[in-house]
């Protein structure tokens, strides 16, 4: 078993997740079975309650774990399905260890960082290494031969020191010949063009304090490091000059694997780990090139949300739209519409609209107005999760005349709460989050046709509220069709409007199941309908 361990020592948020995903994709293209593991030093139990401005979107795995957004990159780049076992948030690790102590599992011993926390980190990494990896498209799961481990944050932080120490012991346990350490760090470039490497040098020095040394240094920045910069990093950081690589800002993150491949990262890893290529399959890399390519025609899709786009709040949705655009052969231009400060002109310049998921009352009036505009003007629309619920509310208000139609999330009581807390199969209200992959039974209609005519699909959910079926039956007389239900048919999951080019709402999150080689059919349907409208 071989391990590629990715970390950084200057600043966070420079692309460790993209580099980790790219390394996985490149090794997979050479015939290896790859899995991923991430250590998040923060003390939160998971990413589920973290604000998008703090940490980007919450990515939902099929088993229901709410993870860091990097897990979306791991799954998309490598076409695999991961589980909560592939993740260590610091808070959950401490919680699990204390829980075991309370249950008597440590037989009265004094709990310490070393050995108890450090050994548990090592145990979890090795457990993932022994767990078969499931491909997204199905097929037989295979035991990995390479694990790409990402350490979040930066080396030298208080929170990271425990985990860096664990990685040092991990190298001792599995052997240096089985570990390759990769640094992803930022080069500061002055206006004069001079590249400053002191931050990278200090990051590598901090790493050596734990008895570790980087094998590869990847320099992020506006430009690649010049020869003098490479030489300085090599000398100061004790890394071979040919293993000092650059990764400048690219037009698309999906071009990163090919850029790193061109500059020799696979050959470097092969030398360090003693790996041999087991074959060559470039199909996924070719698809990455297609996703990153510019097309002649374009389509403008509006995303109506309350979170600012620069905080990665809708990363999976943006990726899903790009995949569908590449599949059709059009550029998808995202039009960001703030649901709290908008004008009708914002809606009018869009060929199609997405109302994404979210929580809380802030900005919902703008979303409802966008839904009304799209429905009345024939603009293709896809409502996701909260967007689905608000679409039902808008139709109940403006088609059925239920002016007080609302959601229990925003108004605890009322006559026409058409969206309410989830209830179980016995009708008992259950306020817990419904999260993870669930089956959806499809009825005849456009949505089923887009899915290829299958009877049942599995989609990822994350919600506490559902549409009250008995409150919305009147919509059936106005061309609204409910065409997707939870297993057993008791909960509405999907609607479509017959007299509209594309007006679809889904309770689940299709963006979490979109892949470069398998764009999601509903999102492709939206992009296709929007492109037709733009002609």
From Swiss-Prot:
GO terms for biological process: 'de novo' CTP biosynthetic process; pyrimidine nucleobase biosynthetic process. It holds the Pfam family GATase. It catalyses: UTP + L-glutamine + ATP + H2O = CTP + L-glutamate + ADP + phosphate + 2 H(+). Gene3D superfamilies: 3.40.50.880, P-loop containing nucleotide triphosphate hydrolases. GO terms for molecular function: ATP binding; CTP synthase activity; identical protein binding. The active site is at 385 (for gatase activity), 509 (for gatase activity), 511 (for gatase activity). Pathway: Pyrimidine metabolism; CTP biosynthesis via de novo pathway; CTP from UDP: step 2/2. Residues 300-535 form the Glutamine amidotransferase type-1 domain. It is an enzyme of class 6 (ligase). InterPro entries: Class_I_gatase-like (IPR029062), CTP_synthase (IPR004468), CTP_synthase_N (IPR017456), GATASE (IPR017926), GATase1_CTP_Synthase (IPR033828), P-loop_NTPase (IPR027417). Its EC number is 6.3.4.2. The keyword Nucleotide-binding applies. Keywords: ATP-binding, Glutamine amidotransferase, Ligase, Nucleotide-binding, Pyrimidine biosynthesis. Belongs to the CTP synthase family. Catalyzes the ATP-dependent amination of UTP to CTP with either L-glutamine or ammonia as the source of nitrogen. This is CTP synthase. It comes from Encephalitozoon cuniculi (strain GB-M1). The lineage of its organism: Eukaryota, Fungi, Fungi incertae sedis, Microsporidia, Unikaryonidae.
């Amino acid at each position: 078993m071989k391990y590629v361990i990715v970390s950084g020592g200057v600043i966070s948020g420079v692309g460790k997740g993209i580099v980790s995903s790219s390394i996985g994709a490149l090794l997979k293209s050479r015939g290896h079975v790859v899995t991923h593991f991430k250590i998040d030093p923060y003390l939160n139990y998971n990413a589920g309650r973290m604000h998008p401005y703090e940490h980007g979107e919450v990515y939902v795995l099929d088993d229901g774990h709410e993870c860091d957004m990097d897990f979306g990159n791991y799954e998309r780049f490598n076409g695999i399905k991961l589980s909560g076992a592939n993740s260590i948030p610091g808070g959950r690790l401490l919680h699990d260890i204390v829980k075991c102590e309370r249950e008597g599992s440590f037989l009265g011993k004094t709990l310490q960082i070393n050995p108890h926390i450090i050994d548990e980190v090592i145990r979890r990494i090795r457990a993932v290494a022994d767990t078969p990896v499931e491909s997204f498209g199905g097929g037989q799961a295979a035991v990995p031969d390479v694990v790409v481990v990402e350490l979040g944050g930066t080396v030298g932080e208080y929170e990271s020191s425990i985990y860096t120490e664990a990685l040092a012991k991990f190298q001792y346990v599995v052997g240096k010949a089985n570990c390759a350490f990769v640094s992803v760090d930022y080069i500061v470039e002055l206006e004069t063009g001079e590249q400053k490497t002191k931050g990278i040098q200090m990051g590598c020095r901090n790493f050596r304090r734990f008895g570790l040394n980087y094998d590869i240094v990847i320099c992020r920045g506006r430009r690649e490091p010049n020869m003098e910069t490479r030489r300085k990093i090599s000398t100061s950081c004790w890394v071979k000059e040919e293993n000092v690589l650059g990764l400048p800002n690219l037009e698309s993150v999906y071009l990163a694997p090919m850029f790193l491949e061109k500059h020799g990262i696979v050959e470097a890893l092969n030398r360090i780990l003693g790996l041999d290529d087991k074959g060559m399959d470039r199909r996924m890399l070719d698809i990455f090139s297609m996703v990153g390519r510019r097309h002649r025609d374009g389509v403008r899709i509006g995303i109506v949300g309350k979170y600012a786009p620069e905080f990665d709040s809708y990363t999976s949705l943006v990726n899903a739209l790009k995949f569908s655009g590449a599949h059709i052969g059009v550029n998808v231009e995202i039009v960001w519409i703030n649901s709290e400060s908008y004008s009708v002109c914002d809606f009018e310049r869009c060929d199609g609209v997405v109302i994404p998921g979210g929580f809380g009352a802030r900005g919902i009036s703008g979303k409802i107005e966008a839904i009304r505009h799209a429905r009345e003007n024939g603009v293709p629309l896809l409502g996701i999760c909260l967007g689905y619920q608000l679409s039902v509310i808008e139709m109940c208000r403006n088609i059925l005349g239920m002016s007080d139609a609302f959601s229990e999330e925003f108004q605890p009581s009322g006559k026409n709460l058409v969206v309410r807390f989830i209830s179980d199969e016995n009708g008992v209200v259950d306020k817990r989050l419904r999260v993870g992959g669930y089956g959806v039974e499809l009825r005849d209609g456009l949505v089923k046709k887009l899915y290829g005519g299958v009877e049942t699909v599995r989609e990822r959910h994350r919600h506490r509220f559902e549409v009250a079926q008995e409150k919305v039956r009147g919509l059936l007389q106005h061309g609204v069709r409910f065409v997707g239900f939870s297993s057993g048919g008791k909960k509405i999951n999907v609607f479509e409007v017959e007299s509209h080019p594309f007006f679809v709402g889904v309770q689940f999150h299709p963006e979490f199941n979109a892949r470069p080689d398998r764009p999601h059919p509903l999102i492709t349907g939206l992009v296709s309908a929007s492109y037709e409208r733009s002609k």
